[in-house]
Amino acid sequence: MSEITVALTPILTRGWGSNRSWTLESYLARGGYEGLKKANTMEPAEIVETVKASGLRGRGGAGFPTGLKWSFLPPDDGLPRYLVVNADESEPGTCKDIPTIMANPHVLIEGIAITSRAINCHHAFVYLRGEVVHVYRRLMAAVKEATEAGLLGDLRITAHAGAGAYICGEETALLDSLEGYRGHPRLKPPFPAVAGLYARPTVINNVESISQVTGIFQHSAQWYASMGTEKSKGHGLFSISGHVKNPGQFEAPFGITMRELIELAGGIREGHQLKFWTPGGSSTPIFTEAELDTPLDYESVGAAGSMLGTRALQVFDETTSVVRVITRWIEFYQHESCGKCTPCREGTYWLKQIMLRLEAGKGQEGDIDLLDEIAHNIFGRSFCALGDAAATPIMSGIKKFREEFEAGLTTPARELFPYEASSNFAKGGVR
């Protein structure tokens, strides 16, 4: 096992196994809110510079430098400005933010308090998926604990449950939803830093991004920057699901490889071998065994032809139909398209129709080339990134597994790859 695998750094996951880890009492016993105490002795600009020095990058998928994002806010004019935490975790395979809030909500609340001081915000919002009522309740209970303990000062934190629309994970659609409107992506500029929630300067960050701020101030910017790679500093949560023996959350420095993470997850299930995997969830181009040793950082994964995204590492063995998996993803994106722009609204519909034909073994001559053409016409032409998310797995799937798409012209996927064989819960499966 390599040195980087050995040097796992449990910060966000530290204490997850503790008795009642979500309570304030448990969090304080683990050194909680010490970072906030330190931040309260610093000027806002100094806090921003500390985050810049740490090299922290956004964990919602884009990887934009967090401190730089905060610095885009215009000078304080004495009127409200807001922090919005994006907890609308809805993409297939992505499952790191919800467990963080469930097991350790105070690490997020402490990060919110530090960030709010940095941007001079007195009202922060956490936007949650509407389906996760239990998470909403746990977060609200933790906010109440911190408020009653006098840890938050005059900061008000509001948890808001959305209505279940995936599009509201897009930051400006989230703002529309938070304001009570139907979630639709907004035209940019103006960017949220200038005119966001209620047309006021707003910082929007992912749950993990804000939670990482806590660790930086509990330790130091230098400590954080010492982990990871030259351009992808620090550590993060890697969510491994699918055909491995022990799926779950693994907190490790950037630069760890998928081969090492699969080893940590107990390996591929017994008697099977890896076929393909996603480095950043269903919206990223798929990888195969050839990329197992690619360092999992933004630059290396990008150079290899995909995106790190939310680090949702879905693992599929040889019993899995690529066509079937991509069809399920396309059905999701077509259903979740907000309908605002033509490429996404019409394109995802036709992608789904063709994929369903291929899955059923009823593909028509020219379907594969048409599928690839539609995907390329959607990519880069939709109003937001949802269109790209639908197109990329199809383009990479055809490139890497064209023979399976060709088989869909005559043979149903269920005959080539029986459902029972790929089920984790079938006889001989993971469990």
Predicted features and spans:
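Hydrophobic alpha-helical positions that pack around
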Residues: 136-254, 266
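Short amphipathic, charge-patterned alpha-helical segments
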Residues: 109-115, 253-271
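Ferredoxin-type iron-sulfur electron-transfer modules in oxidoreductases and energy-metabolism complexes
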Residues: 34-51, 79-81, 87, 94-101, ...
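Iron-sulfur-cluster electron-transfer modules
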Residues: 1-182
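Short acidic beta-strand-loop surface patches of small beta-rich interaction domains
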Residues: 133, 242, 274-295
